[in-house]
């Protein structure tokens, strides 16, 4: 009898061991994916972001910019809450190609300073993670948009969590809000998930010509 039990126990042990190995392998693969998504894609996106930012600055030196085409950078976004040197070049379009380089502008939404809803999208984690800390923005926080000739200062009014299919957040007028020049930023929520969308709204507070303030509003240097 004992000679028949030992093989049974050995088979059970092998099955348990194989199961544990599968679990460990799956865990390692998940960890590698997280590292790749959070760090490796960030590195590549940062290289692309640096290049388009440099190209945009050079373009502005050459003369008045043309109407942006899909995939082209056409302005800079500054968010002092993330650091006084935090800025990202924003591209026209919100397809994967654009968002793999930086924040993108919803093509059918308003432009900076216009009455309407100037709407942007950006990744939360990975591919540059431009909107990683958007959940830290609160009412009154400034969001500065830099174009070739103007600085626009928006002030955050609030945020909301919505379903990914809710596109009304980038429409105009915004539900329950007064008319004006609005800025909306959308990103995934929570971190490491695209189950929902974190939406941040801001209202235009002021605008100043770059000819009058070449270095930008004082709040940029102050890191307000």
Label the predicted regions.
Residues 11-12, 17-18, 23-224:
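Solvent-exposed, non-transmembrane regions of membrane-associated and secreted proteins
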Residues 1-12:
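N-terminal Lys/Arg-rich, disordered targeting/topogenic segments
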């Amino acid at each position: 009898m004992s000679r028949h039990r030992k093989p049974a126990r050995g088979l059970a042990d092998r099955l348990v061991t194989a199961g544990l190995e599968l679990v460990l392998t799956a865990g390692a693969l998940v960890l590698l994916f997280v590292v790749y998504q959070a760090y490796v894609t960030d590195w590549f996106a940062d290289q692309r972001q640096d290049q388009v930012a440099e190209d945009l600055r050079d373009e502005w030196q050459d003369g008045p910019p043309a109407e942006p085409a899909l995939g082209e950078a056409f302005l800079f976004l500054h968010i002092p809450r993330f650091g006084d040197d935090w800025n990202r070049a924003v591209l026209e379009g919100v397809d994967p190609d654009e968002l793999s380089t930086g924040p993108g502008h919803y093509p059918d939404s308003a432009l900076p300073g216009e009455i309407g809803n100037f709407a942007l999208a950006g990744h939360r984690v990975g591919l540059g993670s431009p909107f990683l800390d958007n959940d830290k923005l609160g009412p009154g926080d400034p969001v500065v948009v830099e174009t070739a000739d103007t600085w626009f200062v928006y002030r955050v009014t609030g945020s909301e969590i919505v379903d990914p299919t809710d596109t009304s957040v980038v429409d105009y007028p915004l539900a329950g809000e007064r008319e004006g020049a609005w800025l909306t930023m959308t990103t995934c929520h929570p971190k490491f998930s695209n189950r929902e969308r974190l939406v941040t709204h801001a209202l235009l507070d002021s605008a100043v010509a770059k000819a009058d303030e070449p270095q930008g509003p004082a709040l940029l240097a102050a890191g307000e």
